[in-house]
Amino acid sequence: MSSSSSSSLPTSSASTTTSSITSRPSASHHLESILSSSSSSPSILSSLTTQSTSSIPTSSSSSSQRQSTSNADRPVSPKPMPTPTTLSEWQLLAVLSKANLVQYYDVFIAQGGDDINQIMACEEREFLEIMNLVGMLPKPLHVRRMQRALAEYSQDQTAFNLAALQQIGPPPPLNYTPAGTDPMALLLPGIAAATSPKFPSLRFLSQLSSVAEKVSTPSEAADTSSSSPSLNLNTTSSNSVPLAFKFSTPLLESLASDQQSSSTSSVRSVLPSTSSNTSHPELPAGILPATTTNVSAAVPPPSSRATANVFSGNSIGLNFSGAASVTRHLVVPPSSTSIQQPSTSFGRSSSITGQEKEGSSSPFLGVGYSQPYGNDFVSLGDFDPNNPSLTENPTLSTAQISRLAECALAASKNLPPLPPRLVQNKKRVSKEVIELLKCSPATPSMIHAFRKYSAIYGRFDTKRKPHKVLTLHETTVNEAAAQLCLLVPSLLTRRDELFPLARQIVKDAGYNYAKSRKRPCDPADLHSPISSPGNSPPPQESEFDEQPSSSSGAFKEEERPPIPPEAWAAIIEKMKGELPES
């Protein structure tokens, strides 16, 4: 029994092993059949391939969207400011930076448009051609911004250049000016003279450039602009512009020491001459030169009430440091030694009377003091302003013209160098005025031409009623403007500054004009309530505009030899025999 069971176990195990062995080829055969069937049906593979390939662009597109979103969120680094290599390129960059059009700088340089004066002197058609060359013409708003920046540059180049220093930094200090020429004198003619000989402006620009290179980013420069000291070469000037970078301590110390030494030397040079009046024979008795610091502290701020196209804050430079080097002539009061407080506005006292009289404080003859001349200007002549003529303009006497000439001479000594302007009120200077700038007023015909083109009221190129005569004050202002233009001919092209100067000279001469004074009764205006004698309108704005010129040639500034002081006495004597233009 046991033998039979034992014999059966090997048989069963052998059969099991045999069956398992035989089952393995069947499984492999089954796998081969599946592969053969899948190869025989390519539609399944194609569908799988299509589905997998269709899912790939979706994932790639989503990843590209995520990448673009991350790039958009990433801050874009600002384009670096172009680096000018010459003075003209720096001036072009200053104008474009003011108009926020720096992207056109490279195009301007490539087209040869680095001369701002050439762009300003061209006519409208030429200007539009230039705008077309640089690609600005299709964008009218950019052209308008460019025009506004050029207009602001033409009004006051010194203030414009000061503002450009804090925006784009100083110009390159080397290889852009002729030999022996001071670069700061070209950019800031009124401020370059404030630096002493030991600290020339060329060295000042070099140190300024080295300090500017330490500023890493524009944002850091903007953050430090509020806390950085300001470039205030004149401590009394209200138009100081803070620079957009920090000064180093040695630079500040050297600048302060140079200012102190220059002011001390100017005081020492002036003090010996204050003991007597023999060194200034051209000045009237009682007028002595005073120190620069007293004048700077006593100059009143410009008035907010502007006249004759003079806007608020656009004074002609009485606060310029360049004018500080010129000796100021002040009137020493005979009995008073205390200095009064200056008036609150230019030409207006702090207490205004009911008649609105203009103040008597003068920045030329008596800052803070009483009038050098009493209110006797009208009594020097034969014309009575209370009984004016209805058909003839007033005529000034020889004594009145001589008084105006003396006040104009004292005023001209306190003015900074004023270069002529090619464009004023968006109009070019006429050829006749340019010819007057080239010659000296030594003949009666030249004096007559100066009176013609310096007139403020009743000009030949304005629309004025032919029957409307001038008042005595208007005639006096015209004569004061002519006397001042004889001494400073460039004021013929700077009429917005000539008008307030002429009015101040009239007040210095002793003519305190009351604004409420009525005009003479005009029969032609009796039926016109707008132009009645009691409500006479101010002069039209067109009366202060310069006559447009028909020529398009560029004006070349020629250096004229200065007229010696002793020659002006003979010219003033000739002026006494001349009558003002009727």
UniProtKB/Swiss-Prot annotation:
Residues 396-519 are annotated as: NCD2. One of its GO terms (molecular function) is DNA-binding transcription factor binding. GO terms for biological process: exit from mitosis; molting cycle process; negative regulation of DNA-templated transcription; regulation of development, heterochronic; regulation of DNA-templated transcription; regulation of vulval development. The keyword Repressor applies. Residues 1-84, 257-287, 333-365, 516-582 are annotated as: Disordered. Coiled coil: none annotated. Keywords: Nucleus, Repressor, Transcription, Transcription regulation. Transcriptional cofactor. Heterochronic protein, involved in timing of a subset of differentiation events during the larval-to-adult transition. Promotes hypodermal terminal differentiation, together with transcription factor lin-29, perhaps as part of a transcriptional complex. Involved in regulating molting by repressing the expression of nuclear hormone receptors nhr-23 and nhr-25 in the adult hypoderm, probably acting in concert with lin-29. Belongs to the NAB family. Interacts with transcription factor lin-29 (via C-terminus). This is NAB transcription cofactor mab-10. It comes from Caenorhabditis elegans.
